[in-house]
Amino acid sequence: MARVKRSLNAKKKRREILKSAKGYRGQRSRLYRKAKEQWLHSMTYAYRDRRARKSEFRKLWITRINAAARMNDITYNRLIQGLRLAEIEVDRKVLADLAVNDFAAFSAICEAAKAALPADVNAPKAA
């Protein structure tokens, strides 16, 4: 079997790695081996965090909805329960957007959710 010389392919591969490692600090942007290690870690972090971003945004939406719901004298979990009972299908992303940008519409949704809840659930807890 003939010997395989890799000079062109190896140079191309190294050039691509160093090109994608631009902006890294110190040796990690200049030396191939360090750049490759950092690039592999970077790709791992990017993959992981693309998935984590989804749950982080959901947490943010829930926090915003809860804050706005409490201004309307209802808690987050009662609001969600009321929306289910009233058969209002609005996802958390839209609810959070309404809470921030159109508070009047959010208040109307809260009132509809309150009306759908059973009477004993709306009553405040006795101390």
From Swiss-Prot:
The gene is rplT. It comes from Corynebacterium diphtheriae (strain ATCC 700971 / NCTC 13129 / Biotype gravis). Gene3D superfamilies: 6.10.160.10, Ribosomal protein L20. Disulfide bonds: none annotated. Keywords: Ribonucleoprotein, Ribosomal protein, RNA-binding, rRNA-binding. The lineage of its organism: Bacteria, Bacillati, Actinomycetota, Actinomycetes, Mycobacteriales. This is Large ribosomal subunit protein bL20. GO terms for cellular component: ribonucleoprotein complex; ribosome. PROSITE patterns: RIBOSOMAL_L20. InterPro entries: Ribosomal_bL20 (IPR005813), RIBOSOMAL_L20_CS (IPR049946), Ribosomal_protein_bL20_C (IPR035566). SUPFAM superfamilies: Ribosomal protein L20 (SSF74731). Belongs to the bacterial ribosomal protein bL20 family. NCBIfam families: rplT_bact (TIGR01032). Binds directly to 23S ribosomal RNA and is necessary for the in vitro assembly process of the 50S ribosomal subunit. It is not involved in the protein synthesizing functions of that subunit. It comes from the Bacteria. GO terms for biological process: ribosomal large subunit assembly; translation. GO terms for molecular function: rRNA binding; structural constituent of ribosome.
